[in-house]
Amino acid sequence: MAISQVANTGIPKGARVILFGSQARGDAKEGSDWDVLVLIDKERLSPSDHDLYSYPFWELGWKIDAMIHPAVYTLSDWNTKANPIFRTNVERDGIVLC
């Protein structure tokens, strides 16, 4: 799976990457998008962090003609500020890529 390869080699070490949504559940249809959660262990994200961690997934999407939507959070924000329903869905259905 190319998305797993990007997760393991295309983004800086230390990030936790989780595939979620229909692709993770196995009920994706042709043309379904890919949803990826990127968790960063730092206090605050800068605009350049969003680009640094998102761009490799966007680039893969352009290459394979697929929509890949990375959601980038600090661990702290994920645990305290992320929508609880979103968190529950990721925790239930997510596949850890790295």
What are the residue ranges of the model-derived segments?
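Catalytic core of pol beta-like nucleotidyltransferases
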Residues: 1-18, 24-30, 41-98
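Short beta-strand->loop micro-motif that forms the acidic, two-metal-ion catalytic signature
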Residues: 34-39
